[in-house]
């Protein structure tokens, strides 16, 4: 094999349509656009969503909803998520860095879901009664 003998795979390169090159090609004169009308002219096409002057669908339908600035930014964390964390001291920042809670989280609460197999210390993170019992059962603690 030589560089000057390399060719693209069979059927991978289609030859482009050559329009306006005579009657015999089947795409001569009007180039497959037909006669007259907006679509036959150069630059003659409507914008996306245009309905011929009728009020477009995206403007006929009402706006819906809004993003509340006062929404709760409290998140739930499972025990199995804590088990996967590489650190032993867990606070809100550690949860955010690990991607368990989003960066805009204001508080987090550990819930009894799954199991925990290692000792962890929670700082500034809430926990339900069941989660507290599970954490303390494996030798962990909750510092509030």
Swiss-Prot record:
SUPFAM superfamilies: Ribosomal proteins L15p and L18e (SSF52080). It holds the Pfam family Ribosomal_L27A. Coiled coil: none annotated. Residues 1-54 are annotated as: Disordered. InterPro entries: Ribosomal_uL15, Ribosomal_uL15/eL18, Ribosomal_uL15/eL18_sf, Ribosomal_uL15_bac-type, Ribosomal_uL15_CS. Gene3D superfamilies: 3.100.10.10. One of its GO terms (cellular component) is cytosolic large ribosomal subunit. PROSITE patterns: RIBOSOMAL_L15 (PS00475). Keywords: Ribonucleoprotein, Ribosomal protein, RNA-binding, rRNA-binding. Belongs to the universal ribosomal protein uL15 family. Part of the 50S ribosomal subunit. HAMAP family: Ribosomal_uL15 (MF_01341). Binds to the 23S rRNA. This is Large ribosomal subunit protein uL15. It comes from Dechloromonas aromatica (strain RCB). The lineage of its organism: Bacteria, Pseudomonadati, Pseudomonadota, Betaproteobacteria, Rhodocyclales.
């Amino acid at each position: 094999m030589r560089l000057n003998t390399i060719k693209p795979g069979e059927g991978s390169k289609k030859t482009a349509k050559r329009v306006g090159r005579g009657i015999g090609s089947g795409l001569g004169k009007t180039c497959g656009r037909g006669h007259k009308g907006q679509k036959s002219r150069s630059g003659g096409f409507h914008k996306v969503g245009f309905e011929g002057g009728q009020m477009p669908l995206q403007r006929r339908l009402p706006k819906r909803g809004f993003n509340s600035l006062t929404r709760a930014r409290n998140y739930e964390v499972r025990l199995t998520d804590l088990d996967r964390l590489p650190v032993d001291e867990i606070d809100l920042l550690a949860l955010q860095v690990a991607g368990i809670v989003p960066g805009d989280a204001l508080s987090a609460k550990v819930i009894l879901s799954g199991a925990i197999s290692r000792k962890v210390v929670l700082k500034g993170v809430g926990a339900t009664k069941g989660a507290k019992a599970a954490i303390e059962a494996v030798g962990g603690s909750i510092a509030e």
